[in-house]
Amino acid sequence: MAWNQPGNNGQDRDPWGSSKPGGNSEGNGNKGGRDQGPPDLDDIFRKLSKKLGGLGGGKGTGSGGGSSSQGPRPQLGGRVVTIAAAAIVIIWAASGFYTIKEAERGVVTRFGKFSHLVEPGLNWKPTFIDEVKPVNVEAVRELAASGVMLTSDENVVRVEMNVQYRVTNPEKYLYSVTSPDDSLRQATDSALRGVIGKYTMDRILTEGRTVIRSDTQRELEETIRPYDMGITLLDVNFQAARPPEEVKAAFDDAIAARENEQQYIREAEAYTNEVQPRANGQAQRILEEARAYKAQTILEAQGEVARFAKLLPEYKAAPEITRERLYIETMEKVLGNTRKVLVNDKGGNLMVLPLDQMLKGGNAPAAKSDNGASNLLRLPPASSSTTSGASNTSSTSQGDIMDQRRANAQRNDYQRQGE
């Protein structure tokens, strides 16, 4: 056996411990020769404990005052410590790698104090020294605010509003205020209450929604600006405004009335748009007719002037004949449009000729033509004490003269009988 080979200087190698001269094992009263029995288990465990203790650089002492060989044990212990330290360093370094998403920015703090920002991708930090908090800077965040608020006319209305914002500065978002979302909610509630208190309930529920939305956004921006929370307001949506249930029916009626008013206004505007072009066309047509009539009248007047200019030599040659001819032409024009003609015959009777009825009777059969003479109305002569001109025959004179009204009545009665 390897522990019982020659050349060992008379010493046998004991596999359970260090050998001693004479083949005695350390700490064991039995001999280490071939005649030895099975080793003692207690002795084996004791020696293993000494060896394990020697790995840490300690020195073991053998029983009986003898010292075993301790040369390689300190070197082996140093290697183990180095390997363990290296493993710890590797694990520490590997644990420092982390990833920031594309929509995020990393806020790095060193021993609790802000250090720097990191971009998206794979990054490294010293573990237990730096701490990284990722913040999403691209997502649109929403915050809802609602509550029962008092209006300027001392009414109560329930208002709901939605605020949309985005984080633009991660450092200020995390460390400017304790809780940025809660601070923004409180600022929104304060701004909304301030704006609602400026308007009446009637305007809030009807046409004032756009104005309230813009005023609330402006007030909210002015409120959060001193805090520099690192956020940007994107939009403020005025979602709903409801009156209390006790008066909701009355407000619904008022809203319906306003809607009807707007409907009637739109219908009136549509009617105006329809009628106005037609009226403009008629007005333009009347203007064109007036211009045409003006031009026609001017041309007729110019024609009359030219005609009289041509008649002037004839009038100078024969004044009486020319005057008579002009009189006859004028009477033809005047009597051509007259339905009744009054004729004063030589007997002093005034005849009325209803030309329209006579023209109608001319188209009737011959059997009825005998009644044409009855269409003539003879009035009694107008007596006067003195002779008057032809122009005064129809007027009242001194004496007993028939009243002109009676004469007119008789004419009307005759006209009705003739019809």
Swiss-Prot record:
Residue ranges annotated as Periplasmic topological domain: 101-419
Pfam families assigned: Band_7, HflK_N
Residue intervals passing through the bilayer: 80-100
GO cellular component, one term: cytosol
Principal location class: membrane
Biological process, per Gene Ontology: response to heat
Protein's UniProt keywords contain Cell wall biogenesis/degradation: no
Record key words, sorted: Cell inner membrane, Cell membrane, Membrane, Signal-anchor, Transmembrane, Transmembrane helix
Topological domain spans for side Cytoplasmic: 1-79
Localization terms from the record: Cell inner membrane
Superkingdom as given in the UniProt entry: Bacteria
Residue ranges with Low complexity bias: 383-397
Listed Gly residues bias regions: 53-68
Annotated spans, Disordered: 1-75, 364-419
Family: Belongs to the band 7/mec-2 family. HflK subfamily.
Protein name (Swiss-Prot/TrEMBL): Modulator of FtsH protease HflK
Taxonomic path: Bacteria, Pseudomonadati, Pseudomonadota, Gammaproteobacteria, Enterobacterales
